[in-house]
UniProtKB/Swiss-Prot annotation:
Single biological process term from Gene Ontology: nucleoside transport
Family under the similarity heading: Belongs to the NUP family.
Organism (species): Candida albicans (strain SC5314 / ATCC MYA-2876)
Keywords, sorted A to Z: Signal, Transport
Gene: NUP
Mechanisms controlling activity: Mammalian nucleoside transport inhibitors dipyridamole and NBMPR inhibit adenosine transport by NUP.
InterPro entries: Nucleoside_phosphorylase_sf, Pur_nuclsid_perm
Protein name: Purine nucleoside permease
GO molecular function, one term: nucleoside:proton symporter activity
Protein function: Nucleoside permease that transports adenosine and guanosine. Does not show any transport activities towards cytidine, adenine, guanine, uridine, and uracil.
Domain of life: Eukaryota
Coiled coil: none
Signal peptide: 1-22
Length: 406
């Protein structure tokens, strides 16, 4: 290479080594060859906390409503009902469900996370952190199927939650290991940091309880209550009659009650009774357990962390679960017989009712965006919203004054 060419190349590189980009501004200055950074070159500062600015200046998608499904059976009714014409693939989504689906103008989008807490947290993190999506004003509808507590709902029923309670973060002993020493225990679960099932956990991880916007939940319930739900099959109707509870025997309806999160798929009277009590304990008597799910607390933990930095608005999240089956057996069946050999008429009503009950609030958001939903003021929360740590501010109406973090 000629010296003149080498000099030209070096000049070009020198010019390019000083550059700036927006949000945050980064400046890289060229140092002379063999120059050493001495102590006097380093400015004195008392702030050793590295920080960055937040925002997505290059985002091209700003959906008004986002539907969150967990697996294909929950996703497919939405794909059939909505005019999703765009498929968007971003890094970090489930390898089973790698696409986000959006309508023509990207006003409504849908994501499928994969089942379980890890899949939900991973996929929602990938979505909310992706620079292509500006989700600061987006409303999220978590819409999935769940097991139902027959005291409050039935097969095909629709539930909208104010609280999501994670029941798996506990000690656990096998029946053989506790029934002689603690015959009064309901189950082998014991809250962390205690040796008593009726004592609030002594230490927490922070994901045990989430509370969402009650006013927005109530608006979704108001709209969903005006539509005609799918009542299910003849088999559903016959199976409902095996229960003594009025709610279990009745036709599907929309109810306000709360969701449990557990990776472990449980059933039976023993665990249902314990987790119902645990729900009351964790929420200071405020929550009413009626649906069993596997993802909600994981999704809400991601939303909480991102809301703290302004990337999503936690006030704009709704949790809807439709009931595919009962979480405990009818009196005529054992838990084992019910779980492995039942014929309850199928889950088609719960899948259809995801769209039937979820569409009204989605359409309301889109149709009244400019007048109501963009600002969010009309349905802004009056209750506490967030986690047990008060990450988003305010004072939780559950928990206790202090506990150890684990």
């Amino acid at each position: 290479m000629k010296l003149s060419t080498l000099f030209t190349l070096a000049t070009t590189i020198s010019t390019l080594t000083t550059f700036t980009i927006a949000s945050p501004v980064v400046v890289v200055e060229k140092r002379a060859i063999n120059e050493t950074a001495l102590a006097e070159d380093i400015p004195t500062t008392k702030n050793n906390h590295a920080q960055t600015s937040y925002g997505k200046p290059f985002a091209i998608y700003q959906p008004k409503a986002f539907i969150i499904s967990m697996f294909s059976l929950e996703r497919d009714p939405w794909l059939k009902a909505m005019d999703f014409v765009h498929n968007i693939t971003i890094p970090g989504l489930s390898p089973v469900y790698p696409d986000i689906h959006c309508t023509t103008n990207y006003t409504i989008c849908q994501i499928t996370t994969g089942e379980g807490e890890i899949n939900a947290a991973s996929s929602i993190s990938a979505l909310t952190l992706n620079p292509l999506f500006d989700l600061t004003k987006t409303y999220f509808l978590v819409g999935g199927i769940a097991g139902g507590e027959p005291n409050y709902t039935t097969i095909g029923g629709v539930t909208f939650a104010k609280y999501a309670v994670q029941v798996g973060l506990e000690y656990q002993l096998a029946y053989e290991d506790y029934h002689k020493t603690n015959p009064d225990w309901i189950s082998g679960y014991i809250p962390y940091g205690t040796d008593d099932q009726n004592t609030y956990p002594g230490n927490v991880y922070g994901t045990e309880v989430f509370e969402v916007n009650e006013k927005l939940r109530d608006r979704a319930v108001e709209l969903a209550s005006k539509v005609h739900l799918n009542n299910g099959t003849e088999g559903n109707a016959k199976f409902r009659k095996l229960y003594n509870e009025t709610a279990a025997q009745g036709l599907p309806k929309v109810v306000k009650c709360d969701s449990l999160t557990s990776d472990n798929y449980f059933t039976g009277n023993v665990l249902n009774d314990y987790f119902a009590n645990f729900t009351l304990l964790m929420t200071n008597g405020s929550a009413t357990y009626c649906s069993t799910a596997q993802e909600d607390n994981a999704t809400l933990e991601v939303m909480t962390r991102l809301a703290k930095h302004g990337l999503v608005d936690y006030d704009r999240i709704m949790i809807m679960r439709t009931i595919s089956d009962f979480s405990r057996p009818p009196p005529s069946m054992s838990a084992y017989e019910y779980f492995f050999n039942r014929s309850d008429g199928g889950i088609s009503a719960s899948l259809e009712n995801l769209v039937i009950a979820g569409t009204p609030i989605i359409h309301d958001i889109v149709q009244n965006w400019d007048k109501i939903y963009e600002s969010g003021e009309k349905y802004s929360s009056k209750n506490y919203v967030g986690d047990i740590f008060a990450t988003l501010g305010g004072k939780p109406d559950f928990g206790k004054e202090s506990f150890d973090t684990a």
